[in-house]
Amino acid sequence: MANIERRVIAEGEEFCVECAVRTDLTSPVSEFLDGIEGGAADHVGDLEPDEQIRWYDWFMAACDGLAEYGTLPHRHDHNQLLDGIWEIKHSVLRITFFDTDGSGEYEPLIDSDSYSRFTTRPWPDDFLYYLRLTTAFTKTAPKAPPAEIELAKTVRTEDLEHDRSP
């Protein structure tokens, strides 16, 4: 497998936010963003087209700030889910991501056990430069659906494989 080009959402002093790519060269987040940009996504609950477009605009601006300054607009705009999978959240929509150095290696910065002991939401200052967006979903329950977390981990595994190949 050869290195591939990823859709870059934002690149700045702190991070490069880009879409992860699966083994079959699809990108779930890229496809999701294309849908909500035009208000045409069909798996976003009851969000009307204009709400989808507003969410897209918020997300793109949030990624610009994240890439340049290393932070999201508000401290409640993210969560760590499990095993190094994080989410950017706004309203009911979620986009999962992980960090990497771009070499195909991966090690979670904070595990779920240590995360549960924090009294505030941690934002690791030592995230690696590449933040790869993996999946998108609508959150309708108090916790992220386990199947969504597993899918994000699968996309991460497949995406990192591209980095390991010459």
Where are these regions (language model features)?
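Basic, Lys/Arg-enriched alpha-helical interface segments
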Residues: 1-92, 101-131, 137-166
